[in-house]
Amino acid sequence: MEVIRVKINLCFYAESKLDIMPNHVLGVIIIDNIRSIYGEEGLIAYCMERLVPLCMYKGERTVYNHGRWKLVTHLSYLIDRPTNPMLLRIKEREIEEVMSVHIMDENVGQLYFKLELQQSDFNFLKHKLDPAIKAEGEPPKKVTLI
């Protein structure tokens, strides 16, 4: 079965100097640098509980990753909080490789990672993010093959 690699950027905002704590986080998924912001506190806290904490130091351009990221478990919720069962398979994929993590400014970090998807999952995800089917007033989103 063909596996497709998808590049997704995760942005996080934290008040804490060292650890990203659930109550300090507004989760942001960036797909091709188009931001979709989900500030629903309970959802973000739930997702962040499954992330390995990062140590981040203000003023530095690097973040130290102490383990594998599990955010992809809830990737589908962060994209558009769907109830569609087809996205359940995508939820279960694990991030394959953290490509880079760095501080963009004092409290904002960005994580680039690779995710393996089956062709059917990718087609569905691409369809969900197609600019042609976006809601009124929302920025277009797309998935990038790498």
UniProtKB/Swiss-Prot annotation:
User: Out of the domains of life, which is the source?
Assistant: Viruses
Output this protein's name: Protein beta
